[in-house]
A protein has these predicted regions:
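Active-site hotspot residues in diverse enzymes, especially metal/ion-binding acidic/histidine motifs
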Residues: 1-80
């Protein structure tokens, strides 16, 4: 069931927030995105701390890869 939701969710988010930028969508959903320079191999992570949602992204990646990872972590935030 998650795979069907995963294919529908991006279109719904783009329609609702009038953007395909995952950073803008995260901000609209009150999810804080932070870059981390201490990640070794890890590209990103989603965590909830004291009822606050965070996406952590490896600061050493290209901007294109950061967008991809942010979108991926948004999926974790919304589907799990």
């Amino acid at each position: 069931m998650i795979s069907k939701q995963a294919s529908i969710l991006p279109r719904r988010l783009i329609r609702r927030y009038h953007t395909n930028d995952p950073f803008e969508i995260a901000a609209a959903l009150d999810i804080t995105v932070m870059e981390r320079s201490d990640f070794q191999r890890q590209k990103g992570a989603f965590k909830v701390v004291l009822h606050n949602s965070f996406i952590f992204i490896n600061a050493t990646m290209s901007n294109e890869m950061k967008r991809i990872v942010c979108a991926h972590e948004l999926g974790h935030a919304l589907l799990h």
